[in-house]
A protein has these predicted regions:
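A penicillin-recognizing enzyme superfamily signal
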Residues: 78, 289, 293-296, 302, ...
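Non-catalytic, structured segments within soluble enzyme domains
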Residues: 22, 27, 111-367, 532, ...
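Short, well-structured active-site flanking segments
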Residues: 91-101, 174-177, 236-241, 476-496, ...
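Beta-lactamase-like hydrolase cores
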Residues: 18, 27-44, 192, 306-319, ...
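Short active-site loop at a secondary-structure junction
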Residues: 67-72, 389-399, 422-427, 450-470, ...
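Active-site SXXK
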Residues: 82-83, 229, 299, 359, ...
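Conserved catalytic neighborhood of penicillin-recognizing serine enzymes
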Residues: 110-135, 186-189, 256-257, 435, ...
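N-terminal type II signal-anchor transmembrane helix
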Residues: 1-51, 89, 108-109
Length: 850
């Protein structure tokens, strides 16, 4: 009896000692334990998604793919698959399975090192949220205590829901919702039993048990899960047999992007990181942009087609690489496709290798193993490139352009395949709503994979004659009118600084003598612009440009400003053109309309400052001082003293700080009124004439009238010295668009081409705004304005219409007249008494006006 008594005492002491040890261990570990109460308000990492204005997914940013689901949204069969495999006694224990803990402790004691045993789902949840994945006894003890705490805080269903959304399942997929999409491309409710079991088998080793890494291992692991489900009574023998016989059909499925616009979505990403830091990638933000799918894709297609058209007419630069030469042993198909898979694709351009070639046809192998045929129709364009101004002869047979072993580029045109090449030239397009600044479309280059440099917002390029409408606006605000006569004759003036004559020339070098300002802009006469610049003063003109939002540091204070020597981005140019079309208001471009959190709550909604031509909003600069010399006079030798010029310079009242591209939230406000509404109408009317001209002369943008077949549009070409940059900017109802094209290498110019007859409707001659940039503008605007009713230009209050003589700009006194618009009080008062003859002077080769 004494022995039994002592044995009981010893047992009680051991129990007390064990309990005390556990309590002591708990008190020692307790300060190191995190607060499990945070699980009540846990925010799972969810990627940021970027949408178009019409709700189409454009991009997704974030390291972790996750689709949060409630437990009710997860099929019970999938829940049971995880319970059977990971924790069959889940509903019976209180966070810790004593059998599993005993096994882990025994292994640690007898092996001499820590090794993780069977953890419950609650323990796994504790580890995933609060602990590192290291396999140590200390971490295991913490895991146990945390699991017990979690079971006290949360219900079993809450634990399961968190676990099934948190668990890592391979290929950046976190949670069963993301795994279903990544491996099978469908939501969880559409998964088969076999597919659910495949996913449930992943937590043990997601990198090696996933079906994309090893189908054999994935199948074996799936079968283990099915066996556990059968033994636990979750499925029948028939269901088990059927699921076990299924072949796992898994492929990697990227997020379902409806359409891609990487230059714009990269701008969104940067803005979100600026606002929210790294949390932008984790908190499930939904960002809605201002673009729609139809309009944005029209812009991207217009830019790509125009760049490829330019590139083709300048000739073929040859293969990108030669893998084997004619006569050498050819590579086998696997070696070719392995090589091609290392190369990117650029829009419609795919890398390929020529495997066969004869005079009539070539066969090229694509990266996916497909062979395509290249016939003469798809190769005839490929004249050899000699330089930017010279092309070789048109190929007469296929082998004149391609040979076996060459790595080339191809693209599909209809049902046929054409030889292609990655363009050297690049382009950008920006389109905005002139009333509120919403970006309607933005393209920063030919292809984001080729170059991530966003030319729409980052490229400062000389604007050439695209600047003339702004300068003529300044001149008219100083006293000129659309009927003012300026002398279109050559200029030669000594430049003391340069030590030579400065002789600006028209392009083409034709001169018409005295002409009206409207014609000077419509035909883009350089010397006429220079005379207007001299009349109003360089400093006045340079300062006036800031009204249109152009940064002062990019504006030169020399007469070359008249020819477009200032450098702006396409976005800045589009913003400036909006002022001329919206009644004179400087709107702020923005591209984010709304930001929501992961629950759909609105965090930000744009409230842009709008233009309101009908509102009585004064011009913030006040009235510009008029010059009495800027009346209807011959401007050949007009000059104003420096003192007069400086006294008339309007001081900018707009801050020149960084102009944010995201409109600020707040009450409705109006954009600054920077030029008066009647004046903006005059320049808008003049831009219309740049397209449609007048009897006897054609505007430089005439192709837009032909292509769009509507008269409520206006625009201006722009070409810089040596054609290094080409522009076309203009408006239509509710839209302003600017297009730029040129080389990133400033040493290269756009050159010229000769007609070959091999390309349908090929443009030839000197490149420039009308030939190189305008085709993209025309194609885009035609798509955007399709179905939009024509809206004739309607003069605002303060505009009067007067019949004038075309040659003198005075009141008409005969048949050679037209109606002209004037700001009330500036119309001519004298009748024309004679007609001034027009002298045409031709100083060289004729090529495209700019």
């Amino acid at each position: 009896m004494k022995f039994v008594k002592y044995l009981l005492i010893l047992a009680v002491c051991c129990i007390l000692l064990g309990a005390g040890s556990i309590y002591g261990l708990y008190k020692y570990i307790e300060p190191q334990l995190p607060d499990v109460a945070t699980l009540r308000d846990v925010r799972l990492q969810i990627p940021m998604q970027v949408y178009s204005a019409d709700g189409e997914l454009m991009a997704q940013y974030g390291e972790k793919r996750r689709i949060p689901l409630t437990l009710k949204q997860i099929p019970p069969v999938m829940v049971n698959a995880f319970i059977a495999t990971e924790d069959s006694r889940f509903y019976e224990h209180h966070g810790v399975d004593p059998v599993g803990i005993f096994r882990a402790a025994s292994i640690a004691l007898f092996s001499g090192h820590a090794s993780q045993g069977a953890s419950t789902i609650t323990q796994q949840l504790a580890r995933n949220f609060f602990l590192s994945p290291e396999k140590t006894l200390t971490r295991k003890i913490k895991e146990v205590f945390l699991a017990i705490r979690i079971e006290q805080l949360l219900s079993k269903d809450e634990i399961l829901e968190l676990y099934l959304n948190k668990i890592y399942l391979g290929y950046r997929a976190y949670g069963v919702g993301a795994a279903a999409q990544v491996y099978f491309g469908k939501p969880v409710e559409q998964l088969t039993l076999s597919e659910m079991a495949t996913i449930a088998g992943l937590p043990k080793a997601p990198s090696t048990f996933n079906p994309l890494y090893s189908m054999d291992r994935a199948t074996a692991r799936r079968n283990v899960v099915l066996s556990r489900m059968l033994s636990e009574g979750y499925i029948s023998q028939t269901e088990y047999d059927q699921a076990r016989s299924d072949v796992i059909d898994a492929n990697y499925h990227a997020p379902e992007i409806a359409f891609s616009s990487p230059y714009l979505t990269e701008m969104v990403r940067q803005e979100m990181v600026n606002r929210y830091g790294e949390k932008a990638y984790e908190d499930g933000y939904r960002v809605y942009t201002t673009v729609t799918r139809k309009v944005q894709q029209a812009a991207q297609q217009a830019v790509r087609n125009n760049v490829m058209d330019y590139d083709m007419r300048h000739g073929y630069r040859g293969p990108s690489n030669v893998l084997w030469k004619v006569g050498e042993s050819a590579w086998d198909s696997k070696k070719i496709t392995d090589s091609l898979k290392t190369l990117p694709t650029y829009g419609p351009l795919l890398p390929a290798v020529v495997t066969q070639a004869d005079p009539q046809e070539a066969v090229a192998l694509l990266a996916d193993g497909t062979s395509v045929s290249l016939r003469m129709d798809g190769i005839r364009w490929a004249r050899p490139y000699r330089s930017d101004t010279l092309q070789g002869p048109t190929p007469r047979k296929v082998t004149d352009a391609v040979q076996t072993g060459q790595q080339i580029w191809v693209r599909q045109v209809g049902d046929a395949w054409w030889l292609a090449q990655v363009p050297d030239v690049n382009s950008a397009l920006v389109s905005i709503n002139p009333q509120n600044g919403a970006v309607m479309a933005l393209v920063g280059g030919f292809d984001f994979n080729q170059s991530k440099f966003n030319r729409a917002t980052q490229a400062l390029r000389q604007v050439g004659s695209n600047i003339k409408p702004f300068l003529y606006t300044a001149a008219m605000d100083k006293g000129l009118t659309l009927a003012s006569i300026l002398n279109d004759v050559p200029i030669s003036r000594w430049d003391a600084g340069a030590g030579s004559d400065w002789q600006p020339k028209n392009s083409p070098p034709q001169y018409a003598g005295p002409i009206r300002l409207r014609q000077g802009l419509g035909q883009s006469k350089n010397v006429v612009m220079v005379r207007a610049m001299r009349a109003m003063g360089v400093d006045y003109a340079a300062e006036y440009l800031q009204r249109f939002g152009f940064p002062a540091q990019n504006i030169v204070h020399t007469e070359s400003l008249a020819l477009g020597s200032a450098s702006f981005t396409p976005l800045q140019v589009a913003r400036g053109y909006a002022v001329m079309t919206n009644g004179g208001f400087l709107i702020d471009p923005y591209f984010i309309s709304k930001i929501e959190n992961d629950q759909g709550g609105v965090l930000f909604e744009a409230k842009p400052k709008i233009a309101c031509a009908e509102c009585d909003i004064p011009v913030i600069y006040g009235d510009t001082q008029k010059s009495n010399v800027l009346e209807n006079k011959d401007m050949e030798d007009v000059a104003i003293s420096q003192e007069q010029q400086n006294s008339a310079v309007p001081q900018p009242q707009l801050e020149q700080a960084n102009q944010a591209l995201v409109a600020q939230t707040g009450a409705q406000e109006y954009a600054p009124h920077v030029i008066n509404t009647p004046l903006s109408f005059l320049i808008k009317s003049a831009l219309n004439t740049n397209i449609f001209g007048e009897p006897g002369w054609q505007g430089t943008g005439w192709r837009a009238g032909r292509d769009l077949q509507r008269r409520d549009i206006g625009g201006k070409t722009g070409t810089t010295n040596s054609s290094k940059d080409a522009w076309f900017s203009g408006y239509g109802p509710g839209v302003v668009t600017s297009v730029w094209i040129g080389f990133d290498d400033h040493r290269r110019d756009l050159g010229r081409t000769t007609a070959s007859g091999a390309i349908k409707d090929q443009i030839s001659g000197y490149e420039g705004g009308a030939k190189s940039a305008q085709p993209a503008w025309d194609a885009y605007m035609k798509s955007v304005l399709e179905g939009v009713p024509e809206q004739p230009l309607t003069p605002p209050p303060g505009i009067v219409t007067v019949n004038i003589d075309r040659n003198t700009g005075q009141l008409a006194n005969g048949g050679n007249s037209r109606e002209e618009y004037f700001i009330e009080g500036t119309q001519p008062t004298r009748q024309a008494v004679h007609e001034v003859g027009t002298e045409i002077i031709d100083n060289g080769e004729t090529h495209e006006l700019f």
